[in-house]
Amino acid sequence: MIRSVLASVSPLRQILASQLCTSSITLAGIRPLGPKNKAPDFSGTAVVNGDFKTISMKDYKGKWLILFFYPLDFTFVCPTEITAFSDRCAEFQKLNTELIACSCDSHFSHLAWIQTPRSEVGGLGDMKIPVLADFNKDIANAFGVLDHETGISYRGLFLIDPSGEIRHSLVNDLSVGRSVDEAFRTLKAFQFVEKHGEVCPANWSDDKPTIKPGIKESKEYFKKVDGHT
């Protein structure tokens, strides 16, 4: 079964490789959802702990959620991203945050990819996060990351808060993967703001000072970091 699934996705791999070489795909017309948008109420079949399971946005009520899209199974950059997020899943869960990977492949393709060892040229191996199938492309379309010419999604990432509101989004073109470190830093920054009411400056990390959002109050930060008297 796995071999037949792998054979069926080979043409898709060739399409993606061709697009990466010719740069024929652009972000023209792509309008991803951004801050203050409510996350669409998606539902679909995912591979969870080696089994098929229906998951939905409603399952994550009261939690932070990072939903990230990738173009295709059995490709090149995609497994590096998915395994990197999966391997650090426990760190995100300690912050009441779940992760979902999603593409426009079928759940059978996802399962075949997960059952392929990492040592075999880009297999996923053991997954600690759900890999969601969006075979009808409704989810990618709803989040605004679907390329309608090719039927695949761009590398969109959405940070959704416990109320279901999108707080952060980014979209990469196909050839560049995303940073797990930056996703984790951004999550911690938004959670810090929610808890403390102060705002986070450029390149903030949790061992650095934040800014009190007021004309007079903010001077404390700038004196500290710029050495003003």
Curated annotation (Swiss-Prot):
Keyword Disulfide bond: yes
This protein's UniProt keywords: Antioxidant, Disulfide bond, Oxidoreductase, Peroxidase, Redox-active center
Catalytic center residues: C78
Tagged with keyword Chloroplast: no
EC number annotated for this UniProt entry: 1.11.1.24
SUPFAM superfamilies, per the entry: Thioredoxin-like
GO biological process: cell redox homeostasis; cellular response to stress; hydrogen peroxide catabolic process; response to oxidative stress
Gene Ontology MF terms: thioredoxin peroxidase activity
Recorded GO CC terms: cytosol; mitochondrion
Residues of the Thioredoxin domain: 33-192
Record's catalysed reaction(s): a hydroperoxide + [thioredoxin]-dithiol = an alcohol + [thioredoxin]-disulfide + H2O
UniProt subunit comment: Homodimer; disulfide-linked, upon oxidation.
Miscellaneous note of the record: The active site is a conserved redox-active cysteine residue, the peroxidatic cysteine (C(P)), which makes the nucleophilic attack on the peroxide substrate. The peroxide oxidizes the C(P)-SH to cysteine sulfenic acid (C(P)-SOH), which then reacts with another cysteine residue, the resolving cysteine (C(R)), to form a disulfide bridge. The disulfide is subsequently reduced by an appropriate electron donor to complete the catalytic cycle. In this typical 2-Cys peroxiredoxin, C(R) is provided by the other dimeric subunit to form an intersubunit disulfide.
Family assignment from sequence similarity: Belongs to the peroxiredoxin family. AhpC/Prx1 subfamily.
Function: Thiol-specific peroxidase that catalyzes the reduction of hydrogen peroxide and organic hydroperoxides to water and alcohols, respectively. Plays a role in cell protection against oxidative stress by detoxifying peroxides and as sensor of hydrogen peroxide-mediated signaling events.
Protein name listed in UniProt: Peroxiredoxin 1
Organism: Brugia malayi
Name of the gene: TSA1
